[in-house]
Structures are given as structure tokens and as C-alpha cells.
């Protein structure tokens, strides 16, 4: 029982970490900002966030939803996306267990979550998200192709 609970805690933590990265994508992709090299910062004062300001969900709660430096409000989107992604990961792993399907569905749900928020805010869907979903689908389909192929429908009827 305890190892199962620990596994679900780890899965949730992994989900909120990915959710934190989704927030980076949600903000930076529509603004054409670099998602790799640009440091996270306060949108109000430009304060570069320290590692302890970036702990998903917990930093937001510890800071009361405000910037450490200027005390400006931080959008509630950040903890909501992180928590929602963590819960989605829990549900996927609860349904499919430790499998390739779980990994693929988690990546798919995370991508759709980020894509939905960007679309809601900008009325645009970045092409990169569609290409990622396409690649994910092709890889998943190729992985399961050998398990699901049935040639019985290709047999010719016999004449008697």
C-alpha cells in the first residue's frame, strides 16, 4: 500500500513540474520568447526568480500568490495549470498503470492543456503543438501496430 501511495505522490510531483513548464510555454510561445535560455522573471518588475521561487505549486502558496520582490499578484493560472496537470497525470496512471500508454497520454494531455490555454487567450494554435501531437500519434501508433494488427479480414472466402 505504501509503495503505491509513494508512486502516486511521485507521479503528481512529476505532473506539476511538467505543468510549470507548460506555463512557460503558454506565456512565451505567443510572445515569441525563447523557451530555453530566458530566465523566469516577474511580469511586473522583471525580478529574476530564484530556484526556490520556481518550486511548482508550493512556491505560489508560500509567497501568497505574490512576487517576492515587488509583491505584485501572480496570475492564478500558474498553480491551476500545475495542479490540473498533476491531477491529469494521476488519473492517467490510475487508469493505465506504468505503461507506454500512460506516458503518451500524459504528454498528449499536457500538450492539449497548453494548447487550449494559448488558443483561449490568442485565438491561435501554434503549429509546433500540432506537429508534436502528430509525431506522438505516429510513434504511439507504430509502437502498437504489431499488437493490434489482425489479418483475418484479408482472407479470401472459400468456394465449396
Where are the language model's segments positioned?
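Membrane-proximal soluble regions of multi-pass membrane proteins
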Residues: 25-77
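Short hydrophobic "helix-edge" motifs at membrane interfaces and signal-peptide entry regions
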Residues: 8-10, 109-110
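Feature marks short, highly hydrophobic, charge-poor N-terminal signal-anchor/signal peptide-like helices
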Residues: 1-8
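Conserved small/polar residues in nucleotide/adenosyl-binding loops
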Residues: 152-158
Amino acid at each position: 500500500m505504501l509503495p503505491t501511495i509513494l508512486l502516486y505522490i511521485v507521479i503528481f510531483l512529476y505532473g506539476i513540474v511538467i505543468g510549470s513548464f507548460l506555463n512557460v510555454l503558454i506565456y512565451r510561445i505567443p510572445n515569441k520568447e525563447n523557451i530555453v535560455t530566458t530566465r523566469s522573471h516577474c511580469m511586473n518588475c522583471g525580478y529574476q526568480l530564484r530556484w526556490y521561487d520556481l518550486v511548482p505549486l508550493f512556491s505560489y502558496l508560500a509567497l501568497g500568490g505574490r512576487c517576492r520582490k515587488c509583491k505584485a499578484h501572480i496570475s492564478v493560472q500558474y498553480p491551476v495549470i500545475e495542479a490540473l496537470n498533476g491531477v491529469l497525470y494521476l488519473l492517467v496512471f490510475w487508469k493505465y498503470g506504468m505503461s507506454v500508454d500512460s506516458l503518451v497520454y500524459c504528454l498528449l494531455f499536457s500538450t492539449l492543456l497548453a494548447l487550449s490555454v494559448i488558443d483561449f487567450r490568442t485565438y491561435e494554435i501554434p503549429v509546433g503543438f500540432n506537429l508534436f501531437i502528430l509525431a506522438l500519434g505516429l510513434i504511439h501508433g507504430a509502437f502498437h501496430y504489431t499488437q493490434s494488427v489482425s489479418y483475418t479480414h484479408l482472407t479470401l472466402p472459400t468456394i465449396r
